[in-house]
Amino acid sequence: MALTIFPSINALLNGLTAILLLIGYYFILHGKRVLHKKIMLSAFTTSIVFLCSYLYYHAHVGSVPFKGTGIIRPIYFTILISHTILAVVIVPMAIVTLVRGLSSRFDKHRKLARLTLPVWLYVSVTGVVVYMMLYHF
């Protein structure tokens, strides 16, 4: 497989993660715990696949410079910096949230999930935005 396909695959995985997170949230809001669990495990798995793919790609390609100029440049870097910081933060948050849910510590799970979900969604969506800005503008 050519390395050039990896950024598109990574964006697809990020987008899929965001969709799965929203579906999982919908299910828990409607009391469907079993479906919520299955979908959130799928979101977590998709994120793991993304992370492996992302690391593999950048281990072989390195960093990709942003070629945009003008006002788009500071916008891009603002999004990229916030995305990068929160991408580091979300890893332990998602793991702890997952462990608490799987170990039936639902009060602690719920409390942390209220913080984890918006951060995870932001990271997933801005991952797609960064991809679009870097490769398609």
What are these regions (language model features)?
Residues 1-137:
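Alpha-helical membrane insertion/targeting regions
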